[in-house]
Amino acid sequence: MVDSRQEHIKLGTYPPEQVYQVLQTSPQGLSSQEVKERQATYGPNQLKESKKEPIWLTFFRHFTSLMALLLWGGGFIAMLSHSLELGIAIWLVNIINGLFSFIQEYRASQATAALNKLLPSYARVLRDGKEDKILAQDLVPGDLVFIEEGDRISADGRLVAVTDLQVNQSALTGESNPIYKSDQADLTPDKTELEYDNMVFAGTTVSSGSGHFIVSAIGMKTEFGQIADLTQNLAQEKSPLQKELDHLTKQISVIAVSVGLFFMVAATLFVHQPLSQAFIFALGMIVAFIPEGLLPTVTLSLAMAVQRMAKDHALVKKLSSVETLGATSVICSDKTGTLTQNAMTVNHLWTLSDSYEVTGLGYASEGQIEQEGRPISLEDNELLNRLVRFSHLASNAQVVAPSADNPNFTILGDPTEACLNVLAEKAGINLNDNHTWAPRLKEIPFDSDRKRMTTVHKLELGLDGSQHISITKGAPKEVMELCSDYYDNQGMIKSLTATERQAILAANDQFARDGLRVLAVAYRPLDSEHIGEDKWDMQTLEDNMVFLGLVAMSDSPRQGVREAIEKCHRASIRIIMVTGDYGLTALSIAKKIGIVQGDDARVVSGLELAGMDDNQLKEALKGEIVFARVAPEQKYRVVNALQELGEVVAVTGDGVNDAPALKKADIGVAMGVSGTDVAKESADMILTDDHFASIVHAVEEGRAVYRNIQKFLTYIFNSNTPEAVPSAFFLFSLGRIPLPLTVMQILAIDLGTDMMPALGLGVEPPEEGVMDRPPRRLSDRLLNRQLLIKAFVWYGLIEAALAMGAFFLNYWVNQGNLNHLASSGPLYREATTMTLGAIIFTQIGMAMNSRKGRGSIFQVKPFANRIISLGIVLEIVLFIILTYVPFFHTLFNTAPIGLDDWLYLLACPFVIMALEEIRYRLFDKK
């Protein structure tokens, strides 16, 4: 077996005879003894899976994260506080979250299994001079393997014989056009392994023709195996949101435990409470600071965003990926199928007399031939008629229309030829009638050395005085050299002079600069002395041909892509094209759709990238850049370099070759239509329409999710201050002021009235202008200084003042003074009920304040968010139940309140909304 990449590349430079020597085999194949020895040396032709964490440990890990432990503790505290149902509910939320996370991680680990599915089960080999069908896993280096149309190739190898062989290497390169294969030595310098036409690779498929090759690499040594090795050995990084939640729970834990210990010690030393009561009191304070609804709210917010994204053709496999999209600063996008249609379309027709545009996109036959916007009919233009008809006659591809089983066009054959069929249909030609008019008698297939193909047709009605013609299509320069004449727009055949030849080459060069693929079409009327199978040799059929014109085609940009890229630029998101296509084509498309905006953009080929060290690559990544003809590990390397520069990277891909980069990226995006199972398993998100614009919609949702989590945190932490301040009054008055808010009342707020509005804030739609701001920095915190000041100081102190005002006002109204405040009985319970009610009703106003984001309260549509509206109704209903149903009076230390008290409570939300609007107009609006 060839061990090094460099030795493998050298195989492409050897003639077939030398390949047998290098790989120590013969045209009769290996002997049985040699096979046994090599199986012992090299092992089976299989992809190996690296050792993984036991499934039970993975399962257990999802229930012991810091936030999970906080929730287990919160549930336990609730049970200690005589609230068994609430404690069980918290634990159920924890179990559901843990199970969901485990399932997501388990599914994401199946990429290697999907890779194995792409390898065939059997192979046809020559051993001991006899053909045999064996298990593909039993192949060894040196085996002589037969392949034909439809076969999936089972190992890497060097071709030693071919017959019209074409191989689809899209699984490795991402480019869907079949590659014409050769068995001849290729001495072209500076080629990568995948660029050698005389090499074949495991996991690719034979599109047409046949051949046989000598196995040079098996299992993990193949290109396929190296991709598998890269893919499965990548450590699964935590998403930015997961890292943030870990950081947040640590902060909350420190705050909660510190406050709890402080109040327990203070209650014991200064108020002389028994240690058991002080402990329960401290537990209540810890509960006040633990956001029990954090995980379910985050999960719901992400899940609702996932639902909205699904409507925009983006299926998210991993919930935390939604927010990661919101932090994305760079998108590394493939070209074919994502930015472009993945459908070759004829855009221009050129003759020595005129040039024409062709409208329509993709393989649909809607469109027409135009000249300066005016439709052109073939009936009035014989030159154009011949160019279009003959292009189709020399095509072997078929376009299968969408059906109930397959909603997309299916191409049988070469996509370059398929678009010639579509061109003919746009021109009004019936394809079957065209074949009937000029049935094919012979074909000289396309050859990568000749760069053209030729067909022979019989015309019953005749053409130019002959009933037989040959048609040649291929590379313009090669076809032009076969021509002695050209056909003009007057129906005349004229001599092709140096002037016309220069014009043809100039037109071809211009099309190439525009990123178009160009075919030239020519024909030759065959006179009677050249009729007959024995006379149709290449020299005869391709001699003294008549030049018709050029057909220029491209994989056109998708509709809406340019607008999506402009949106990314406004949002300060860079787009970097990383493609397997050629540099000029890639740069042309990049300019056309706005990825590249300057004239000094750099195109880096895979070969050039291989010569760069990491520092040079990072420096190159700072400017406008397009990567072309890159290998799988190079795409991975580009992603890694960007991450080391501090970028949050999203990567799109559809092939097996994209799997390592998809897994390495912060967010991997696979194509749902054209993508392989391997790409889909490796990705975090799947685009059901393969459209780049869908990623941009997803980024918008991701940004909204982060803002929604901040809104939710602001909302729930607002009530922490008014929950803690009453306890401070109790402690600092040395018990002379009775406890204005009990532990059970704190639990009623945190696990009851606050939950539904908080969940509603988690599903707010994206704010206006969310894509006009740069992505958040990774150093930005969910619980940042601004949020802490806003929640605990500004909003918190307002709520605390309103809550304590309600408490003291109740005593003042009912007792006439604030001396000797009762610490038990109906008056005390009524006062604590007012404290509880003031916090609940102020939180209603806070729900509206949180919804407004960076704008004015008057911009908020009060009933647009149904969950918040329902939550407000439910918290009012819950407060009424706690206040007026006698069963709850003892448990929650509540009592009925009067109409005057209700007027105070109903004013609370409007007070906090008014104060926030004043603050906004004085500070934020400016």
Which residue ranges define each predicted feature?
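Conserved cytosolic headpiece of P-type ATPases
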Residues: 1-775, 779-783, 797, 836, ...
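A C-terminal functional module that forms or caps the active site or interfaces directly
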Residues: 850
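Membrane-helix interface motif
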Residues: 804-818, 884-889
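Generic alpha-helical transmembrane segments
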Residues: 753, 830-847
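Helix-coil boundary and interhelical linker segments in multi-pass alpha-helical membrane proteins
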Residues: 731-742, 809-830
